[in-house]
Amino acid sequence: MTTPRPASLWRHHDFRQLWMGDTVSVFGAQFVGFAMPLMAVQLLGANAFQMGLLATLESLAFLLIGLPAGAWVDRWRKRTVLVLGDLGRALLLLTLPAAWLLDVLTMGQLYVVAVGVGVITVFFDVANQSYLPELVEGEQISDGNGKLQASQQTAMVAGPAAAAAMVRLLGSPLTIAVTSVCMGLSSLFVSRIRHREQAPDPAARRPLVTEIREGLSFVLSHPLLRRIVACTGLSNLASSGVFALFVLYALTTLDLAETTLGLVLSLGAVGGLLGAVSSGWFGRWVGEGRAIPLAAVLSGTAMLTVPLASVLPAVPTLLVGNLLISWGVVVYNIAQVSFRQRLCPKPLLGRMNASIRFLVWGPMPIGAFLGGVAGQRFGLVPTLWGLVALSLISALPVLLSPLVRMRELPRELDALAGDAGAR
């Protein structure tokens, strides 16, 4: 008797709603991610330190509440978290164009909105990553992640160019208003999901500290997850510093117009789209395990193009670099996220994802703050070279691990990867 093939996700109603909602939401995130730094630089005259501080506050919540957020999300219905999260972010972001119209916009307000959106995003992202296994079967998880990543990369391709055009036409404040509309639409799509999660049993709750410890223990006790967390955390520490300074660097040191910057980012993001559609083939070619260190090395090395753009032709250098970075990051993420989703028991998914987010996103506000301080003190280009050196080092935990000898990744908790797990 043969096992029937799983139904196509194209015909899966609930996955389609999640997919459409996620796609609209990430388009909105691209708009605000492009427009808010421009607003700070062009309308409020922000310097390197202020740009670093803004980026720090955007991700600070992952460091401060990332761990308890996972335990809380495991106690709530994830669909509700997603719907309310998008609505909350939409309302917060709407205060920026409102303040601009009233001529009362300040850097202080940008900081407050960054913190508020960051707090909501912590809960939203943990619920979002934990929700897919609720809707699809285990063997469909990789396919679902691939489709979600393809949409996200499509948004990254079209988003910056579209945002640049909107900024040119409407200005950065009204472009952020478009983001609010996108997030409202996202909440509408997700609210149409028919699947009803089983309500967590309040009687089964344990002390918050115990649940947090359980999530951390799951991640840190697995030898492969430890390596992946170390690599991702170091990479995020470096890249957050780079990206905190990137818009200021592009507009001042490289003298790029905002439309040129948007096109460079959009064309570079084609690499991520190619990564989303080729990740399965690449994993089969080199092996699931090997795909992770190879993608990490490629994306880390490609970061060299950012400071090199100050001495080489800027546009082609950044374009090639962004193509390679985007491809490597997406292939890496699809492989490692699918691995941990397959490995983790469903009741632990929220805490596991929150623990990993805390460990790998927690360094981001630190990197952004250090990047801003160093950029103000030592200059943009020397700071970027230092951050890129750290990006190269970040691949070592997975490069010097059993992953480089593994074609297949473990799918069971008792298949803890060591040398015996290599194939």
Sequence positions of predicted segments:
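Alpha-helical transmembrane-bundle signature of multi-pass membrane transport and export proteins
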Residues: 1-423
